[in-house]
Amino acid sequence: MLTQIKQDAQTRMTKSIDALRHSLTTIRTGRASPALLDGIKVKAYGADTPLNQVASISVSEGRSLVISLFDKGMIKDVEKAIYASDLGLTPTVVGTVIRLNLPPLTEERRKELSKSVHGEGEDSKVAIRNIRRDANQQVKDLLKDKAVTEDEARSAEDDIQKLTDKAIKDVDEVVKGKEQELMTV
């Protein structure tokens, strides 16, 4: 029973870190990345469709993205969706392809994005601590029901704390890596 609680806590903490990593891929750094456009939805065939399902997105020359549409009639819709996104990018239509040139980030914008990254990291830490609290509560409930001894419960809580410390360290490393990526000119 305690092993299951610890495994569940570890799985949930790992998912929280993965969610942070995914969330940070959408924050623009100096380099072009197709993941930057993951959040963009296009009005296609009567529904909001993710951009990567109606086009292939590739990096060109490090600072620009090339969007090749599967259906050439959707150029205006894709262009409109990019303008509507809060990425601050201006699409350039070249024939049947859309180019997005990423301007270099200003120092002020880098600091702003760095704060945003730090905030996302803090949110992940809070989620991890909540997972720890839930797991410890399950252990205490088992102790109250006399399903485990006090020593087993204390040992399980120590193990859960070690998992929490490791997960928070991982979050710090992910945030630090993203901040370094942002500050690299």
UniProtKB/Swiss-Prot annotation:
One of its GO terms (cellular component) is cytosol. Disulfide bonds: none annotated. It is found in: Cytoplasm. GO terms for biological process: cytoplasmic translational termination. InterPro entries: Ribosome_recyc_fac, Ribosome_recyc_fac_dom, RRF_sf. Keywords: Cytoplasm, Protein biosynthesis. One of its GO terms (molecular function) is ribosomal large subunit binding. Pfam families: RRF (PF01765). Responsible for the release of ribosomes from messenger RNA at the termination of protein biosynthesis. May increase the efficiency of translation by recycling ribosomes from one round of translation to another. Belongs to the RRF family. This is Ribosome-recycling factor.
